[in-house]
Amino acid sequence: MAEITASMVKELREKTDAPMMECKKALTEAGGDMAKAEEVLRIKLGNKASKAAARVTAEGIVGTYLSADGKLAAMVELNCETDFVAKNDDFIGLAGSLATLVATKNPADVEALSALELDGQTVEAFRTALVGKIGENITVRRFSRIEAKGQVASYVHAGAKIGVLVDLVGGDEQLAKDLAMHIAASKPKSLDASGVSQELIESERRIAVEKAREAGKPEAMLEKIAEGTVQKFLKEVTLLGQPFVKDDKQTVEALLKARGASVASFVLYIVGEGIEKKVTDFAAEVAEQAAAAAAKK
């Protein structure tokens, strides 16, 4: 068998971007044949990606694209398993590339995005290779695209864990940026009350009625109290009803009216929102591994 030298490992790593140890193992398995070692790595990296696919991806970042004229924008949520990988340059680069593809190619859904070309291969092939290189599952969760009616501002906060796009008609660039920051801070669910689901409103109403009843309020007053509670709730969760973060004496709606502007739409992404994260009990995991090892003896 040919001796596996450091220069051979370095050459294979430069060709494949695979981890050093994986390159050395592949060269050993291939008997020092570089071409065969590349094939071994392709198989192994593919297998690693398949094994990783079952693991929960609740960490990650948002990637954004904004055209120079502010008329076209896109945002992608790219997920991984750990915050460590979310800071990886290749991972960050992929998020940005995907946002650019969404803006310029306008795919219908994640499946269509995965079939687009990126660096001479499909997005899915690129993702699979990166999973193999990094050793963690990576998933494209969602994306949004805006063709502006006015001008789009983008804002990314908290290590790219929160991303905002807002399409402002009228006003100016600074107002658009301020609104994007407001959305990141106040996290509205919709532009106005019409965007809040009736199911959520009725749920808040029922809760308000029961709370008022438990507090001993007269039955005749329950509906009126509940209506007041619902209206307060709607102001809290709608962009137009919220107090503006830079001047809480006025609502966003009042601010826009004073500036002769309106919000055509906005998108808010919070990474991992709604994904159930796996909480690992380290002591229990070690005990489980020890028990499994003992059972093999």
UniProtKB/Swiss-Prot annotation:
GO terms for molecular function: translation elongation factor activity. PROSITE patterns: EF_TS_2. The keyword Secreted does not apply. Residues 82-85 are annotated as: Involved in Mg(2+) ion dislocation from EF-Tu. The keyword Cytoplasm applies. It comes from the Bacteria. Keywords: Cytoplasm, Elongation factor, Protein biosynthesis. InterPro entries: EF-Ts_dimer_sf (IPR036402), Transl_elong_EFTs/EF1B (IPR001816), Transl_elong_EFTs/EF1B_dimer (IPR014039), Transl_elong_Ts_CS (IPR018101), UBA-like_sf (IPR009060). It is found in: Cytoplasm. GO terms for cellular component: cytoplasm. Associates with the EF-Tu.GDP complex and induces the exchange of GDP to GTP. It remains bound to the aminoacyl-tRNA.EF-Tu.GTP complex up to the GTP hydrolysis stage on the ribosome. Belongs to the EF-Ts family. This is Elongation factor Ts. It comes from Azoarcus sp. (strain BH72).
